[in-house]
């Protein structure tokens, strides 16, 4: 996955490039089932009172770090076709206690009108939990809490009982019920590597990790287990319309005896599995590789399990499952059947090892095997999709700096349904209405509803007028602060092309004054500078500190065609860097930009950009900040865990002396240009970041100090590629602005 994406909403995905579930991954996954992995919780949260919505008074009318952490973070939303109710999740954080709680709210359909109240939806039930999924019977909601699955009805819970030692109740990570509600898939970790204690029982307190192959670490953990799906019989007893008992019987590991992952680490959820409408087939995503083969390949496939494989004592193993995507060498994932079962859809990338290849929406006829690429004319990436009916799908995609909603039929006929200065995440579709999460650089996630049926739908602009806001989660914050203005600018690159650049202005901007200005360097390296809302890289926070922010969609970012997106692999120090400099060079000519007070900031590949520009900026900048950035590309090639990414993006290994692309990449390693460093730099890193190891920041800091360059180092021993805990998040913000103010505002 990509190195970076602080697009805190769903997702997305992915700290390096991904499918935005990650990108929307920062708050929670968008499917009913797996617990979101982007939220931070203390290890003993279940023993404490749940965190509720904080009350906060913000002085001065400007957004603060404390204000950011007081915001409710809306994640999943699911609609019940039987009752019309909506269930959604919202997470609250306690800075004082350094922990969070995720709540589920159930809302009545009567509250969902074209004129919702200022308080948003009328809540009829609220409780602690995550991953809501409608059970499909008289308003029963299935959800997760504390690693267990519950059924909730009329404010009362019924835990699904499990009396089988093969299922670790309390450690479950996801669930997916069959349409007939007679079976359930439970996801749990299965041990795949013998521990030190297994080998030496007399050393139970030894902490060493022993490994004999690659992929021994992934994202922020040592790889000693794999998530695997257990198929179980589900027995539910009722008294009238009410659930009286629920139990699980006959668990069967669909990947028994293997080390394979399903869902795939580190961010996969139950969206990577799908039941057929008749409950007789399971389609699942799996990369059936281990060790070195796993580390160098993105070749996952969609497999089909059916017949005896779905029976408790049935014959056959995963080796008997049908590979529906055999021959496609890139990522294939996230299968979903049409309501009538005639088609199965999934997301697909073509090339092995290229995790940022075009993400295509594919369908396959379940009878004839005919395959179709539905988004062939899109020239961009599909983020997520849902079936609307038997012949129509909805999906979101990035184009020219925003993520919008589209509708496509089985013949590939596509209609753009929305436009505007926002990003949308598709949460659910029910009774001709799409439920989306909408956010922008000026507003965090809120739930909206949009009609999506009918042959005569209006154009995207008119259709966007039908977006109805259903929640107003953070109105109490917005009422106390003034947000800055966000403006799209099309700037000219050094090779004569047009580049979309977002310019963010401080609140109460005065064009007769001059402002310190920041060049924001995006990560990924192929994650778009869309209308994202982040709880660290928050442009409204930067604007609140009276900075202008220049955020270019440089070469290598999606949403501007395939050629633009791919003009970065093997050329880290090339046109993408010239694009960044072109953006700041043009903006500094504006009379309100103080060209003597320019800063440069970025994370992941953006951190690489900062380190590289520190040796090439020719005096433009007065301060740098790099978060989780690459300083030494040769070390990064060996240290990062997902070797496919290093191979593709760097063009090969540094010892391949006749490989011109690889040699060009490594010649542009920032550490080679330290002799030209002369500008103050702040280096930030998390020690649990196994995508880019923390020694990169330590080396950069040491190099600066040994060069006599003012530098500061902020290391988080317990954070990964992101900063997730509340107090660390505020420490990050304070350090960030203290450094910038010191060098860009001090007399």
Each language-model region and where it sits:
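C-terminal motif of bacterial Sec signal peptides marking the signal peptidase cleavage site
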Residues: 32-33
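Cap/lid segment of the alpha/beta-hydrolase catalytic domain
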Residues: 290, 465-466, 472-596, 603, ...
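Short loop/turn segments that connect beta-strands within beta-propeller blades
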Residues: 109-110, 153-156, 234-237, 306-308, ...
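Predominantly five- to eight-bladed beta-propeller fold
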Residues: 40-52, 101-102, 186-257, 285-288, ...
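Arg/Gly-rich low-complexity intrinsically disordered repeat tracts
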Residues: 10, 109-116, 307-316, 454
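Short glycine/acidic-enriched loop and turn motifs that connect beta-strands
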Residues: 92-96, 148, 191-194, 289-291, ...
């Amino acid at each position: 996955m990509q190195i970076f994406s602080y697009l805190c909403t769903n997702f997305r995905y992915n700290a390096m490039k991904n499918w935005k579930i990650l990108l929307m991954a920062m708050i929670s996954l968008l499917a009913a089932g797996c617990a979101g992995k982007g939220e931070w919780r203390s290890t003993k949260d279940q023993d404490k009172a749940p965190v509720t919505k904080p009350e906060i008074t913000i002085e001065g009318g400007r957004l603060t770090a404390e204000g950011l952490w007081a915001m409710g973070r809306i994640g999943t939303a699911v609609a019940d076709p039987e009752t019309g109710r909506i269930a959604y999740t919202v997470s609250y954080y306690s800075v004082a206690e350094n922990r969070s709680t995720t709540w589920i709210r159930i809302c009545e359909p009567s509250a969902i009108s074209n004129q919702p109240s200022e308080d948003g939806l009328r809540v009829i039930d609220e409780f602690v939990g995550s991953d809501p999924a409608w059970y499909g019977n008289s308003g029963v909601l299935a959800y997760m809490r504390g690693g267990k699955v519950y059924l909730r009805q009329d404010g009362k819970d019924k835990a699904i009982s499990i009396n089988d030692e093969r299922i670790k109740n309390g450690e479950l990570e996801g669930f997916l019920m069959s349409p007939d509600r007679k079976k359930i898939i439970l996801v749990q970790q299965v041990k795949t590597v013998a521990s030190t204690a297994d080998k030496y029982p007399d050393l139970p307190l030894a902490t060493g990790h022993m490994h004999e192959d690659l992929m021994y670490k992934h994202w922020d953990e040592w790889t000693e287990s794999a998530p695997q799906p257990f198929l179980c019989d589900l027995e539910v007893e009722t008294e009238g319309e009410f659930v009286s008992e629920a139990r699980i019987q006959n668990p069967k590991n669909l990947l028994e005896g293997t080390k394979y992952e399903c869902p795939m680490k580190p961010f996969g959820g139950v969206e990577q599995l799908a039941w057929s409408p008749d409950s007789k087939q399971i389609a699942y995503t799996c990369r059936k590789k281990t060790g070195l083969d796993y580390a160098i390949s993105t070749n996952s496939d969609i497999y089909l399990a059916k017949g005896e494989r779905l029976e408790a004592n049935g014959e056959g193993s995963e080796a008997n499952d049908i590979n529906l995507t055999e021959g496609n060498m890139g990522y294939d994932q996230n299968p979903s059947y049409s309501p009538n079962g005639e088609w199965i859809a999934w997301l697909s990338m073509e090339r092995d090892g290229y995790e940022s290849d075009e993400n295509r929406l594919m369908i396959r006829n379940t009878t004839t095997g005919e395959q179709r690429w539905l988004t062939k004319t899109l020239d961009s990436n599909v983020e997520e999709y849902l079936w609307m009916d038997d012949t129509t799908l909805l999906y979101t995609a990035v184009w020219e700096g925003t993520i919008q909603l589209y509708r496509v039929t089985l013949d590939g006929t596509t209609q753009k349904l929305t436009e505007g200065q926002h990003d949308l995440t598709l949460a659910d579709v029910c009774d001709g209405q799409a439920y989306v999460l909408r956010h922008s650089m000026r507003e965090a996630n809120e739930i909206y509803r949009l009609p999506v049926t009918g042959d005569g739908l209006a154009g995207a602009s008119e259709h966007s007028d039908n977006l109805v806001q259903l929640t107003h989660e953070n109105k109490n914050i917005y009422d106390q602060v003034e947000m800055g203005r966000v403006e799209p600018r099309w700037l000219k690159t050094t090779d004569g092309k047009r580049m979309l650049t977002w310019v963010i202005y401080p609140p109460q901007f005065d064009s007769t004054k001059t402002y310190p200005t920041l060049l924001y360097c995006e990560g990924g390296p192929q994650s778009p500078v869309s209308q994202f809302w982040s709880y660290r890289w928050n442009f409204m926070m930067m604007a609140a500190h009276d900075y202008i922010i220049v955020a270019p969609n440089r070469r290598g970012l999606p949403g501007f065609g395939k050629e633009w997106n791919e003009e970065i692999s093997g050329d880290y120090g090339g046109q993408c860097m010239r694009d960044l400099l072109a953006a700041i060079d043009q903006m500094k000519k504006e009379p309100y930009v103080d060209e003597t007070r320019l800063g440069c900031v970025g994370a992941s590949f953006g951190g690489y950009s900062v380190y590289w520009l520190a040796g090439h900026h020719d005096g433009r900048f007065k301060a740098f900040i790099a978060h989780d950035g690459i300083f030494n590309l040769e070390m990064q090639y060996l240290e990062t865990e997902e070797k496919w990414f290093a191979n593709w993006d760097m063009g090969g290994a540094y010892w391949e002396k006749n490989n011109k692309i690889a040699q060009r990449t490594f010649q542009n390693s920032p550490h080679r240009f330290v002799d030209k460093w002369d500008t103050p730099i702040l280096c930030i890193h998390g020690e649990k970041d196994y995508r880019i190891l923390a020694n990169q920041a330590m080396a950069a800091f040491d190099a600066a100090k040994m060069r006599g360059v003012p530098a500061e180092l902020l290391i988080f021993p317990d954070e990964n590629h992101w900063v997730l805990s509340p107090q660390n998040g505020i420490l990050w913000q304070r350090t960030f602005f203290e450094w910038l103010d010191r060098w860009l505002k001090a007399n």
